């Protein structure tokens, strides 16, 4: 019984394979033999050669080169240069120049000149 079961599946596969091979070779035996060798030879060479070279070469060069140069160069130059020049130059010139000239000039001249002349002149005559 066991030997009969083993023979059944073994004879089935070879029968199926023989039918498939005999069908395409019977009608045109010379035609399918010539294009079958030239076709699989051409597409197998340029396919794996082209996508394997330009893929890892293009994205690895422009990515780390562009963002590393313009970032640290722009914000470090215009920031400390503009606010350090116009700020301390304007408030230090007009403040100490105006209030120191007109104040001590008008108040010290008319006061000591009027009360010292009429007072000692009236008391000595009586």
UniProtKB/Swiss-Prot annotation:
Similarity comment: Belongs to the cornifin (SPRR) family.
Gene Ontology cellular component terms for the protein in this record: cytoplasm
Region (11 X 8 AA approximate tandem repeats): 31-122
Chief location bin: cytoplasm
Organism: Oryctolagus cuniculus (Rabbit)
Coiled coil: none
Pfam families registered for this protein in UniProt: Cornifin (PF02389)
Cystine residue pairs: none
Protein localization: Cytoplasm
Region (Disordered): 20-43, 104-126
Residues modified to N-acetylserine: 2
Annotated Sequence repeat ranges: 3-14, 18-29, 31-38, 39-46, 47-54, 55-62, 63-70, 71-78, 79-86, 87-94, 95-102, 103-110, 111-118
Tissue specificity field: Suprabasal layers of squamous-differentiated tissues such as epidermis, esophagus, tongue and trachea.
Swiss-Prot/TrEMBL keywords: Acetylation, Cytoplasm, Keratinization, Repeat
GO biological process: keratinization
Function (record text): Cross-linked envelope protein of keratinocytes. It is a keratinocyte protein that first appears in the cell cytosol, but ultimately becomes cross-linked to membrane proteins by transglutaminase. All that results in the formation of an insoluble envelope beneath the plasma membrane.
Induction of its expression: During squamous differentiation of epidermal keratinocytes. This induction is repressed by retinoids.
Region (2 X 12 AA approximate repeats) location: 3-29
Protein name as catalogued: Cornifin alpha
């Amino acid at each position: 019984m066991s030997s009969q079961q083993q023979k059944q599946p073994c004879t089935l596969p070879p029968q199926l394979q023989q039918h498939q091979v005999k069908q395409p070779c019977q009608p045109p035996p010379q035609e399918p033999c010539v294009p079958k060798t030239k076709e699989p030879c051409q597409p197998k060479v340029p396919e794996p050669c082209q996508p394997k070279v330009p893929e890892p070469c293009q994205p690895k060069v422009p990515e780390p080169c562009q963002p590393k140069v313009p970032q640290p160069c722009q914000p470090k130059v215009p920031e400390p240069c503009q606010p350090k020049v116009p700020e301390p130059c304007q408030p230090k010139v007009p403040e100490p120049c105006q209030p120191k000239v007109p104040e001590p000039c008008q108040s010290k001249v008319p006061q000591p000149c009027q009360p010292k002349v009429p007072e000692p002149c009236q008391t000595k005559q009586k």
